[in-house]
Each structure stands twice: as C-alpha cells, then as structure tokens.
C-alpha cells in the first residue's frame, strides 16, 4: 500500500475559462473594409502553486487584428487548469508545469478564442499549434537558468 502512495501522480482537477475580453473599437465601420486584416498572436504561460501538490496553470492568448492602422478586434483570453502533481521529482515539476500542462490547456483556449471571434462577426481565425517545449526552453534561456528548477514549478 505504501508503494501505491509513492507512485507518480498527475491529475487534471479542473479546466476553465478564467477571463476573456473582446474589443471592437472601430465597428461597425470596420466590417465595410475590403482589405485583409493583419493578425498578431501572443501566448504566455504562468503557474501558481495553490497547495503543496496543486498548481493553477494559466495560458493567456492575445489576438489583435488590424486593417491598415485600425484595430478590427482585440481579444484576450485566459484558459486555466488546476493540476494535482504528486511524487514527481522536484527537477521534473517545472517542465511538467511549463510544457505538459499548457499543451493540455491550449486546445481549449484556441476553441474559446475562435468561437468569440466568430460570434463577434469576423471570419474565423484558427490559431496554430504551439511548441510549448520550445517556448519553455526559450524562457529558461532568457532567465539564464536562474533558479528555473528551484522555483519548483512556478514560472512567471
């Protein structure tokens, strides 16, 4: 029985949309524009330890579409998940929280953003898959490796 208690454990407790905002500062006139919009996408990942083995992971997506110099829409969504992570070596928690958890959450974020854009009256925008491992490694390089694993799963 004690062997079972020491087994690595990873569980999704909840996935939820934490926040979403949509702005259309130039509607309805923007709907008359014939030019294709330019689209910028930004993604960020944050993690917070809620309890000894429980983490909230937050994947934020910001999509800005512009026609010429006018903003067609700006949408920001924060997709969150609560994950229970137990009996995982400390040096493996940060990559799990920074790579695996965001990879699980991103399809929900992508769906919520696409739905909001369509409901706002714009053509659908499908966000491409994101390589969260590359994003994680880039973040580590920017931090210069400073206490990345020592943060014990909390990335900022």
Swiss-Prot record:
GO terms assigned for molecular function: unfolded protein binding
Keywords: Chaperone, Cytoplasm, Protein transport, Translocation, Transport
SUPFAM superfamilies in alphabetical order: SecB-like
Location in the cell: Cytoplasm
GO cellular component: cytoplasm
GO BP field: protein folding; protein tetramerization; protein transport
Similarity comment: Belongs to the SecB family.
Subunit structure: Homotetramer, a dimer of dimers. One homotetramer interacts with 1 SecA dimer.
Job description of the protein: One of the proteins required for the normal export of preproteins out of the cell cytoplasm. It is a molecular chaperone that binds to a subset of precursor proteins, maintaining them in a translocation-competent state. It also specifically binds to its receptor SecA.
Protein name: Protein-export protein SecB
Organism: Paraburkholderia phytofirmans (strain DSM 17436 / LMG 22146 / PsJN) (Burkholderia phytofirmans)
């Amino acid at each position: 029985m004690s062997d079972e208690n020491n087994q690595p454990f990873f569980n999704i407790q909840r996935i939820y949309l934490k926040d979403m905002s949509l702005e259309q500062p130039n509607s309805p006139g923007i709907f008359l524009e014939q030019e294709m919009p330019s689209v910028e996408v930004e993604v960020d990942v944050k993690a917070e330890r809620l309890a000894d083995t429980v983490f909230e992971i937050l994947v934020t997506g910001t999509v800005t579409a512009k026609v010429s110099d006018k903003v067609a829409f700006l949408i920001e969504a924060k997709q969150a998940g609560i994950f229970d992570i137990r009996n995982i070596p400390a040096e493996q928690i940060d990559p799990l929280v920074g790579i695996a958890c965001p990879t699980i959450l991103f399809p929900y974020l992508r769906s919520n953003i696409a739905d909001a854009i369509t409901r706002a009256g714009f053509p659908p925008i499908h966000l491409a898959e994101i390589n969260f491992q590359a994003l994680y490694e880039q973040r580590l390089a920017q931090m210069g490796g400073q206490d990345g694993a020592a943060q014990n799963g909390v990335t900022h």
